[in-house]
Amino acid sequence: MEYLKSIGYKDDFLSYLKDLKFTGSIRSMQEGELCFGNEPLLRVEAPLIQAQLIETILLNIVNFHTLITTKASRIRQIASNDKLMEFGTRRAQEIDAALWGARAAYIGGFDSTSNVRAGKLFGIPVSGTHAHAFVQTYGDEYVAFKKYAERHKNCVFLVDTFHTLKSGVPNAIKVAKELGDKINFVGIRLDSGDIAYLSKEARRMLDEAGFTETKIIASNDLDEETITSLKAQGAKVDSWGVGTKLITGYDQPALGAVYKLVAIENEDGSYSDRIKLSNNAEKVTTPGKKNVYRIINKKTGKAEGDYITLENENPYDEQPLKLFHPVYTYKMKFIKSFEAIDLHHNIYENGKLVYQIPTEDESRDYLAQGLQSIWDENKRFLNPQEYPVDLSKACWDNKHKRIFEVAEHVKEMEEDNE
């Protein structure tokens, strides 16, 4: 408060802020819910100043977590049943991003993290390997691996410090044979070079030495695209350590979720809808208090699309349900047998938390289950079929009504200024 006062805020406003408590209500999608462009992830109903004060923190949380969870989910879909380890702490923008990014990656489908604090805070399994510096300290891979094995029952040896195939893998095998049942030779890690070639050669060497169950872990600037390529080349990799390109959202470093006013309460308790127009069609908001439903075809068990309605609408009132593209309205389909799942849950009611916050494991499982309801054609990475996000007829009509109202208002202003 002293700082705010020092930059010019008045005492009466500071006194108001000091006693301010959130009294509004929030409806939101569940963590781990699949979401798509142009649909409301959450809805805030509160006095205007309260709604504005929470804007920045809401966008900060939603944008970052959604970005990293989405990237992690994409990698999980490509990796299939392979183990995925989050290795991004060193490359994260800062320590909080590393911690929360590890959590987001776990919810997105990763199996573990190398960030021990994230493991402690969020109950995420922890995994990792020793560093190149450990091998360099001893100057000899055989000595380093043996020293490591003396202290660790479960051993994963990093084999690319000097020469992967001439030194690293042979010395890992040598130590494992010498120590036998005293250790579990869990795996080796490849962190540089031609991963496809090296993994195939390393697999051959391990198998010939009798270590057919020893796993090969790969890292080094991986993401869904490089993993896809390596799999296509027949790489013999069992687990993937993904860091930089996950934790930074490398190919899309920022998510563009926005927070917009869509209605305001009048003195008599009624609501007036609000719209923001733009020369960019995708930035035109959809006015009014809205709900979002996922329309599941009962025959296929798959999602036909998401259906945005005004608050007082019930999708079941329209039989069959008509879905049409909000821009190319001639694109339409009719769904006769469907389930409409309300994607918004009551989180806060009149300032009180009324929602049971799920655990990280529950959110992770929920996301994985949700993916099963989406057609493969919508999930493919190359030229995916657009997932429908449609407006109800009433919602579509209301939007265009508001557009024309604003256009008339602008026209009147132009005439007044002439």
Name every feature range the model reports, one short phrase each.
Residues 128, 217, 238-241:
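Short hydrophobic alpha-helical runs that function as membrane-insertion/retention elements
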Residues 6-14, 94, 319-327:
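Short, positively charged
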Residues 26-32, 338-343:
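Short acidic, Pro/Gly- and aromatic-enriched capping/linker segments at domain boundaries
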Residues 8, 14-23, 32-212, 222-232, ...:
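Buried, small/hydrophobic-residue-enriched core segments of structured protein domains
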